[in-house]
């Protein structure tokens, strides 16, 4: 297959439709939208500002709370159960981004998952080892990407992974 790689840069996310589907503000089976996640994540320090500023505060809070870990002895991780992940304080990309998405929705910021695969940085080499997910939130009419689990794995790139996503992915 030929894959066109394109880095997603802050402020250049895909344009959102004028009417945002309600699903991007609604709870799901494993992501409540009733204030519980927000309280667990930031306590009484509710983020303020515009959507980007509030999402950035949530991004930092999730990164501070969670550790990327997939222990074989604990079967709870990887399901995207946001409350479980908040309490366990570890998990994979699905767990990190479930918390972020739920907290964004608690603040009335539309947010969604983007599922796909990480691909090797060098074209034509390596293998795809498994799925990865990212989160996107709506700001200024555009879907902005975040990768909090990669920020946790690569602290030197923490600032980059808020608003930017590498070209090394297929979604």
Residue locations for each model-derived region?
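A short glycine-/small-residue-rich loop at the edge of a beta-strand within enzyme catalytic domains
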Residues: 49, 84-91, 95, 125-126
């Amino acid at each position: 297959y030929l894959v066109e790689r394109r880095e997603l840069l802050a402020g250049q996310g895909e344009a959102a439709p004028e009417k945002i589907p309600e699903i991007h503000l609604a709870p799901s089976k494993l992501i409540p939208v009733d204030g519980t996640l927000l309280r667990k994540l930031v306590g009484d320090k509710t983020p303020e500002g515009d959507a980007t500023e509030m999402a950035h505060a949530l991004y930092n809070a999730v990164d501070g709370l969670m550790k990327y870990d997939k222990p074989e002895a604990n079967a709870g991780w990887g399901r995207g159960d946001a409350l479980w992940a908040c309490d366990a304080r570890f998990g994979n990309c699905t767990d990190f981004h479930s918390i972020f998405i739920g907290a964004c929705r608690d603040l009335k910021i539309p947010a969604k998952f983007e599922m796909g695969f990480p691909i090797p940085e060098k074209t034509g080499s390596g293998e795809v080892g498994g799925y990865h997910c990212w989160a996107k939130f709506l700001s200024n009419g555009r879907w902005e990407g975040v990768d909090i689990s990669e920020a946790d794995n690569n602290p030197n790139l923490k600032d980059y992974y808020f608003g930017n996503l590498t070209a090394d992915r297929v979604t």
